[in-house]
From Swiss-Prot:
Transmembrane spans: none
InterPro entries in the record: PsdUridine_s_RsuA/RluB/E/F_cat (IPR042092), PsdUridine_synth_cat_dom_sf (IPR020103), PsdUridine_synth_RsuA/RluA (IPR006145), PsdUridine_synth_RsuA/RluB/E/F (IPR000748), PsdUridine_synth_RsuA/RluB_CS (IPR018496), RsuA_PseudoU_synthase (IPR050343), TruA/RsuA/RluB/E/F_N (IPR020094)
Biological process annotations from GO: pseudouridine synthesis; rRNA processing
Protein name listed in UniProt: Ribosomal large subunit pseudouridine synthase E
Family: Belongs to the pseudouridine synthase RsuA family.
Tree of life domain: Bacteria
Lineage: Bacteria, Pseudomonadati, Pseudomonadota, Gammaproteobacteria, Enterobacterales
Catalyzed chemical reaction(s): uridine(2457) in 23S rRNA = pseudouridine(2457) in 23S rRNA
GO molecular function list: 23S rRNA pseudouridine(2457) synthase activity; RNA binding
Matching SUPFAM superfamilies: Pseudouridine synthase
Length: 217
């Protein structure tokens, strides 16, 4: 009886060890397979009111309705109420290069604001403003004409007839939550429409709103 119990325990331990070896081996194999995949980079011109993800439990519009490509994920966020360039990739190193603050990758935005910013307001944006999560890095900020490539937004923005609007070109080197909107509001000119045009070396470059294309890294 004693021999039977010892034999049974030994069999159980051996089986558990074999299970561990197989599980860890499978994990390494999956990781190697992922690392050996060729890099894919998708550029998408995100419309207004689309989430920068492929699923949503509440039924809102997602990337799945536009991009039939599996295994790629957005590098950084572009809020539901913002438009423009979204870079998706399966390469973690590329995602980090585009989004990590220490990389200081430039991101260009065209921003329609309420009112016409003064030179003092532009200088404040360039030098950095102090938000509730700390001071921002110096940024590029200039008053520009409405972009010639601009597409109509659906629905249109709500403008007040008594207040003019203007366009800014803003370049950030960090990526905080809703940073552009908070910066323009801080200097007294609320954002009405926000379009990301470029991230690092990637740009919209005549990509139509709601369309995507694959590029080489």
């Amino acid at each position: 009886m004693r021999q039977f119990i010892i034999s049974e325990n030994t069999m159980q331990k051996t089986s558990f060890r074999n299970h561990q070896v197989k599980r860890f081996s499978s994990q390494r194999s999956t990781r190697r397979k992922h690392e050996n995949q060729p890099t894919r980079v998708i550029l998408f011109n995100k419309p207004y009111d689309v989430l920068p993800q492929f699923t949503d439990e509440t039924g809102r519009k997602t990337l799945k309705e536009f991009i039939p490509v599996q295994g790629v994920y957005a590098a950084g966020r572009l809020d539901r109420d913002s438009e423009g360039l979204l870079v998706l990739t399966n390469n973690g190193a590329l995602q980090a290069r585009l989004t990590q603050p220490g990389k200081r990758t430039g991101k260009i935005y065209y921003v329609q604001v309420e009112g016409i910013p003064t030179q003092d307001a532009l200088e404040a944006l360039r030098n950095g403003v102090t938000l509730n999560d700390g001071p921002t890095l110096p940024a590029g900020a200039e008053l520009v004409d409405e972009p010639a490539w601009l597409w109509p937004r659906n629905p249109p923005i709500r403008e007040r007839k008594s207040i003019p609007t203007s366009w800014l070109k803003i370049t950030l080197y960090e990526g905080r939550n809703r940073q552009v909107r908070r910066m323009t509001a801080h200097v007294g000119f609320p954002t009405l429409r926000l379009i990301r045009y470029a991230m690092g070396d990637y740009s919209l470059d005549n990509l139509a709103n709601g369309e995507w294309r694959e590029v080489t890294d």
